[in-house]
Amino acid sequence: MKIPGVATVLGGVTNGVAQTVRAGARLPGSAAAAVQTLASPVLELTGPVVQSVVQTTGRAIGVRGSHNESPDGMTPPVRWRSGRRVHFDLDPLLPFPRWHEHAAMVEEPVRRIPGVAEAHVEGSLGRLVVELEPDADSDIAVDEVRDVVSAVAADIFLAGSVSSPNSAPFADPGNPLAILVPLTAAAMDLVAMGATVTGWVARLPAAPQTTRALAALINHQPRMVSLMESRLGRVGTDIALAATTAAANGLTQSLGTPLLDLVQRSLQISEAAAHRRVWRDREPALASPRRPQAPVVPIISSAGAKSQEPRHSWAAAAAGEASHVVVGGSIDAAIDTAKGSRAGPVEQYVNQAANGSLIAAASALVAGGGTEDAAGAILAGVPRAAHMGRQAFAAVLGRGLANTGQLVLDPGALRRLDRVRVVVIDGAALRGDNRAVLHAQGDEPGWDDDRVYEVADALLHGEQAPEPDPDELPATGARLRWAPAQGPSATPAQGLEHADLVVDGQCVGSVDVGWEVDPYAIPLLQTAHRTGARVVLRHVAGTEDLSASVGSTHPPGTPLLKLVRELRADRGPVLLITAVHRDFASTDTLAALAIADVGVALDDPRGATPWTADLITGTDLAAAVRILSALPVARAASESAVHLAQGGTTLAGLLLVTGEQDKTTNPASFRRWLNPVNAAAATALVSGMWSAAKVLRMPDPTPQPLTAWHALDPEIVYSRLAGGSRPLAVEPGIPAWRRILDDLSYEPVMAPLRGPARTLAQLAVATRHELADPLTPILAVGAAASAIVGSNIDALLVAGVMTVNAITGGVQRLRAEAAAAELFAEQDQLVRRVVVPAVATTRRRLEAARHATRTATVSAKSLRVGDVIDLAAPEVVPADARLLVAEDLEVDESFLTGESLPVDKQVDPVAVNDPDRASMLFEGSTIVAGHARAIVVATGVGTAAHRAISAVADVETAAGVQARLRELTSKVLPMTLAGGAAVTALALLRRASLRQAVADGVAIAVAAVPEGLPLVATLSQLAAAQRLTARGALVRSPRTIEALGRVDTICFDKTGTLTENRLRVVCALPSSTAAERDPLPQTTDAPSAEVLRAAARASTQPHNGEGHAHATDEAILAAASALAGSLSSQGDSEWVVLAEVPFESSRGYAAAIGRVGTDGIPMLMLKGAPETILPRCRLADPGVDHEHAESVVRHLAEQGLRVLAVAQRTWDNGTTHDDETDADAVDAVAHDLELIGYVGLADTARSSSRPLIEALLDAERNVVLITGDHPITARAIARQLGLPADARVVTGAELAVLDEEAHAKLAADMQVFARVSPEQKVQIVAALQRCGRVTAMVGDGANDAAAIRMADVGIGVSGRGSSAARGAADIVLTDDDLGVLLDALVEGRSMWAGVRDAVTILVGGNVGEVLFTVIGTAFGAGRAPVGTRQLLLVNLLTDMFPALAVAVTSQFAEPDDAEYPTDDAAERAQREHRRAVLIGPTPSLDAPLLRQIVNRGVVTAAGATAAWAIGRWTPGTERRTATMGLTALVMTQLAQTLLTRRHSPLVIATALGSAGVLVGIIQTPVISHFFGCTPLGPVAWTGVFSATAGATAVSALAPKWLASTVGVVQPDERPDDAEDSDAGG
């Protein structure tokens, strides 16, 4: 489709530029002719634009005419035309509400026109959509349609109720204005550039920069833009501003600004062209007469103009200035969208910059600077970078989305992504393509709930019903009888239907039917969590299982419009993801889409078209996932653009003040047209494009189906998965350039360089991450400012410090990642994949899979959905799988559930809502007993274990020490900048030159920036991380070490963390034992040993080197073997086993038949659950003895023990050595048993657990135990670990009914939590944090991963721990000794103290430098007493090496083991040392540190000022005086540093070395002169040392007097001596 005028413009502009170049400098007339040549095609192009402006202006000033005026004679304008499809705008002809109710009167006559194939009215668009016949003359047919519509509209108008129009034309991406407006602006930029080049070549005089300043004032003043929009409309305003700017740039011969704007407009043109192409491709399906017509939702957009008439401009939206609306008149009250009314980071800065530039211009005029200076101030404050950064990001992102087929109706929505604070996900968008049974109920015998479910599910999927079990009935002739449909609901529906299951005419059950969840629902929610926005889910039927994945939920039927409106009012801009289905109330959905700041709708071809959406995606959620991925990137891109704009404005202002801007007279100078503002804009443009490209390069999400496999019959599961009907994981696409590079890297010449190149690339990426620090822009601007005022050396220093810090941090990051990769590189797990023969039917293939003997050993990573795997004890399950065969199967799922005991598994389906899902195996669980075959249903990111880490909303990692240092920097920087301003002001008062005064002020401000802070934080954390790694704690995130120093609450997962997750025998009690005997007897007692011997005889013995069949067998046999003299290492040497019956959950016991010796009487020995064994026993007094037995069992259970009863009887039958026959015989004979006693088993606590808990409690730390075990077990374990015996146990059920406030209050007082889910673990940690606690979470399972991430410090336990837990952890314990936790806490304290003292040195020294410089400037000769190079010297000698030495040195001196006579004494000293450190005051970077900084700054300034004053009062030059002040400035700081770490050899050596370097520099003539100093004599050195000693003595000997004099409280709660003594313990 052609766009009117585009070819003309392109050709004309190209010819005009060529003529301009050829014209050269021949004469002004030629240049003028060339400019005219350039401008003529632009004027030709602006016809449609001018028409739009005239219409908008006419509406604004009320020229539209009377509302009662008939549109007779008007013809409907063609709004869009492509091929045989034409859109006619009906709004001008039918200017009254509810006109679309007369749509049939328009459609019928048009359909009768020859050449018209189809015609229908899209009420939401206000358009008549016509499709012409292939052989029709399109021009004639269009004219006839316009005539017919005009006549029909006149009749409707006369019969209709005329009122004020409240609708406006729909603007689609096919509107020519979408391209014409940015193309017009680009052409104007080319004209301006041509005029500029012509002026340069012809040496024509340029207009003053006041011209450009006036254009900038109009273009970048929000109030001015709003005023113009209210008069000209957005299109007119955009064109007027573009013309004004282009004219100003051409007259002033400025090339940089139009060039940048041309690049920006080119991006907008390419974006609009891409959207236009997608509109052309998708319009036939979206505007199809076969789709239901959407209700017309009247919308009023209050953004921009004052008029309350609904309005929209596509062209303005393409520039990000308008919101998309669709209007009509079917309901009474219009909805005010207010899209874009909440300012984002760019808008906030633009307003600030507008006010600031006006103030700066006014100040320049008041100071007598003239109009040129005022114009320079305005131009310096232009926020061009802020605008262009966001525009570039949105344009590239929009073009990328269009290239994947996504229809962007409002490009302005992409410009609003940076301000989204709430993500609302409508459950309707999560609906998959297939129906699903959500609830089943059986109503007849032989039809239980599970049977009804599987039959109904098979019917929904068009499958044959599975064969019934023996106790079930066949499903021959089964069908679903649906309840009468109610039609689309008037209120939001929940997507639920009811049906009866009918078999042979009889209703045997009923089902509730909804929809499967979209496979991309989980990736969508996971991505939403990573955006940092609040995630809200409105449920529909079937999405309840996703509740734990969001911040808040709302039940089905909640009005979406009301929800979005309330969230936007309470929390900020909202992004809505929804879909319009035919069984939902589309009015509510369309209205919600209209008011959402960003409305994303999935396209359901069976439902109404969501015209009110800003973006219409495809039928799945993959594109919505990418849009959500763009949110944090958009926010970061806008913030980066704002920072660049601030930096450009700062540097431009500095150039203006120093007069550097006027030095370049050549108009074609690169420095002139690429000024700081334009340089910042160019950087923001490239950065925005790169950020958008990063989003588009993200791999497509992997689908994660949430089918209820556990509730389906194995045959159904096998047919769906092994039959290939389920999609496999999406393979990530590899860009072509990456494939080419990979191919080249394997060439013989390049192969040796592959490794180093990869390492350098990784280092570059890591370094770039380190540079993403808020201090980096500040330091970069400071370096540029130093270069501007001539201090290139200082600029290089700051840049060098930034680079060294980033590289150091990058190296540390790579080291940590490499160590973590080495630790986490799990051994390539091998698994037996069953080779299934190729047979005809699914049922036969399933039987073959169950019984096939051929297997192939493959890597677990190669498994795919549908593979059948073979598993046996003690193998680890490699993927989520549905059981096909389960023989005596028990599985340890403690890593996922927290339950320490194995769980039984079965093949039969379980209820769809059954939380145990006994027919499933989950990745990471361990086969404890039995054998299994299962079909893989999920691998990789789709497994339950992997989802555990991202299953909880709003989980964020704690801020590190960098964040606190940035906060401190934000407090200190204003003071240092004020010091620089004070130096400049004082110098001006002393009549110094403006340039010199500004140079001194900049030098002080830049020198006072604590550029060493990032390096101090990095190296201190690196040192602490290395020390901890050497002790067995791998630090994956060094930034969290700082939180270790503040941790006051440690939360422990029990199973696998404090315990070994291995059963052990705790006690063995004879049956005659008292009911509540306490303490329990030792197993070495003779009666207990007999019970243990009997239990061992009943246990299944390992055969042929195989493992134990059951965990209880292993524990009992191990305990029996430990009884010296009673049992041998392999069992009872006198016991001869005749037959064994292994434990099965269906039996509830294990049994063995044997005899003692060769002549002994055969005996039947049993052990099992008391509820199974006791009823089979012979009791003397059944009532009393049974009650006594139950009391004993209850008492043992209350101790947290798993209880087994042991019994025996004589065996009179023979054995067949056939397991099944013997099992049946035993079960028949196992009555009238003799009860021998009971065995109590429990999880084995780690040997280091109790000492750790006791040490933490002794160090006044709060310990919280969190477990999934029963409350009785939890209480018993807590007592064993050293927690108070009366500790109350709170269950997850109790937590579930509490609100956040009650939750926090309860969590603050409790120490033991039992039966908690993974989500509740996160809630417990969050509640503790709300109470002000600094938390650490220690765990090893996937169910701990989210809580580990939530805690301030996450600690994972290695070994058998889950990879999810280790991946979420900040610190990983690499061995079984939990005592290293104490070392970690001590290291955290030490690091905090080191950082605190290093920050005091850095910032306090800078404060002293500022104070000294201000005093010297005020009382000196108007010059700062120290210059830029001298401040450089101070930073080198006092800030860098001494501060770093302090940062990496522990404040607390550890005891030396060699000083103690015995190991016990050394261990005692270590314990006392740890306790002394941990119970001491918590180091802080808050108010106490600020007081230390002020004190150090005052002492430093006092010493330097005293030496400087002595120099002034003694004979000598001014340079000598300045040198004395500089020397005392350094010496005073070094002396205070020595006081801070006088026990550290490293600090002493560094301080003395720095002092020696200073003396050498001062006394060496050439070097001294280079730094602006002079060698000092004896008198001068005496004055320096006296001043240094006096100031240092005041700091050390009279801290209280110093504090009261300065006016602050001394921060140190203890003097260093006390700290050292305590530390030494």
From Swiss-Prot:
Reactions catalysed: ATP + H2O = ADP + phosphate + H(+)
Protein's membrane topology: Multi-pass membrane protein
Source species, domain of life: Bacteria
EC number: 7.2.2.-
Gene Ontology annotations for the cellular component aspect, listed alphabetically: intracellular membrane-bounded organelle; plasma membrane
Claim: RNA-binding is one of the keywords in the record: no
Signal peptide: none
GO molecular function: ATP binding; ATP hydrolysis activity; metal ion binding; P-type calcium transporter activity
Transmembrane segments: 148-168, 177-197, 358-378, 637-657, 673-693, 778-798, 968-988, 997-1017, 1401-1421, 1432-1452, 1547-1567
Database matches in NCBIfam families: ATPase_P-type
Family: Belongs to the cation transport ATPase (P-type) (TC 3.A.3) family.
Stated name of the protein: Probable cation-transporting ATPase I
Organism listed in the record: Mycobacterium tuberculosis (strain CDC 1551 / Oshkosh)
Lineage of producing organism: Bacteria, Bacillati, Actinomycetota, Actinomycetes, Mycobacteriales
Name of the coding gene: ctpI
